[in-house]
Structure formats: structure tokens, C-alpha cells
Amino acid sequence: AYEGSNKRFMAGWLNTVLHPMEKDGVDFWWIDWQQWINDKKLTNLNNTWWINYVMFSDMERNRDTRPMLYHRWGGLGNHRYQIGFSGDAIISWKSLDFQPYFNSTASNVLYCYWSHDIGGHMHADSIDPEMYVRWMQFGLFSPILRSHSTKNAGLNKEPWVFSYPVTRILRNIVKERYALNPYIYTMARKTYDNALPLCRPMYYDYADSPQAYEMKNEYMFGDDMIVRPVTAPRNGAKATADVWLPKGNDWYEVASGKLIKGGQTVNDGFQLDEIPVYVKAGSVIPMYADTLKNLRGNDNPVVVNVYPSDGDCMSKAEY
């Protein structure tokens, strides 16, 4: 039986079971553990928080690599343990519609890296291609992009199991995620330095604007982008989304390339391969070319995307 508060038990489990596999090449563990809430011997010891602490502390023994943990939320203070698994997501538009809000407002407890079951995990026997594309688009502009589902042949999510038009869209999403790595990494460094998350509610940057508190599915993706994922099925050829663009800046709509004046809410239509993403005028976005297939090493040429504004001097520190 599991005894998380028993030092001898935990040492034996780590030394006998996990450490040998780490020597064989395992980099980190997804501890998808559904144990009882509190330890059976120590009153009020939360098992999830405790296993996070034990596992992370154990990984710190190897100072040649950065410890990384992937487990469920253990309560306040769990931001110390980097990546959180948000649980088994139900496959539905309603579930997708909740995740952008859930993801960004985790900033309020300093939790910056949620990993969701992109596409949903359970309670369906087949995948709606449109819903999966929209979920992947949200994943593209999330801290972690991880497609996942329960074991069911009808829920396979490899890009090539869909029709060619959907396969092409999914492939481009993955390519764009790779391409965005310099920007994401730069913003991750800022998260490390000042605890400002990559994905955060609009009111973090525009606290004086009432609209910033009303747009629940709209969020900042780093310092320079607004993202409002499509979370409902399209009506005809396009899905519509209301997007609030803060005043004080103009904003480039990535899907169309048009420049829109800030200080208004726009309602645009987006085809299945389009995402409501807006880049602040005056921004410099470092990216890789969309031909990149491997993020190892730092020798990939960086493409600098400039979004000009009137009269501004633009700069960007890139890590």
C-alpha cells in the first residue's frame, strides 16, 4: 500500500523503481496519481501537494539538470512545481469554452503552466474535427501543447487520421508552435524573473478598463499578443468571436493582416484555419522559420517579425 508520509517507503520506491528508469533515459514523470486527498497517518497532509514536494526534491539531487514536475494541482504554493495537469477533460464544446478562462485566471495563484487534454479525454466515441481543430488552436497559444485522450480507437488524434484539409490545418498548427518558440521562451524567462505568466487575464495589463474584466476567454499571450480562441461551432463557413482591443494601441489582426484601432470591441468571422490573434502595433516578435523540425540547440536562424506603429522606436530582448 502507498505510504507517502513513510520515509523508508518513499526512499525504497524512488531508489528501486524510478531511479533505474531515469538512468535509462526518463527525463521527468507525469504523476497522474488519484490517491485519497489526505494522508491516512498524518492529519491534514495533502497527498497531492506532498508527492509534488517529494518528487521535486528528489530530482534536485541531480544538479546537472533542472528538476521538472508534471502533476495535479496541490493547492496554494504549488506554483513551485512547474507543470499542472488540469484533469480528464470531457470532450465537448462546453469543456473547450471553459479552458481559456481557467488557464489564464490561474495567474491569480501564480500558476503559470497548465497542461490540458487538448481535444478532450473522455465521454465521447469519436472526434469532431472542427472542435479538435479549435482545441488545438487554443493549445497553440497555451503554455503547454499536449494532445491526449483515453484509449479508444475512435479518439485517435494523429493529424493524418483526418481528412486532408483538417490534416493540413493541424500540421500548420504544430509548425507554428515550433516557430513561436523564441517568443514563448523569451516570455517564459520574463515569467521566471517577475512571475508574470505567459497566459494572463486582460486585467493584468489593462486594469483600469472595465472590459478587461468582462472578456473571460480573451487573454494576453506574452506582452505583445491578444488571443481569443474560438470555442463554439461555426455558423456557415465562419465562426464569429467578439474581441476587445484596448485603447492606447493599434492592433494587427493576424488572420487578415489589417490594422485596427484600439479602444473598441470587434466582431469578426474566422474560417477553420484562422485564429483570433491580435499583435500590438510597435511589437517585435522573434520566431523560427516554419520549416523547423527540432528545437534542440540554439543554431536555428531567428526570423524577426516587425509590426510597425507611427513614430515608435521598437526593441525586443530575446532569450
What feature does the model see in each segment?
Residues 274-319:
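Accessory, solvent-exposed terminal regions and/or long lumenal/extracellular loops of proteins
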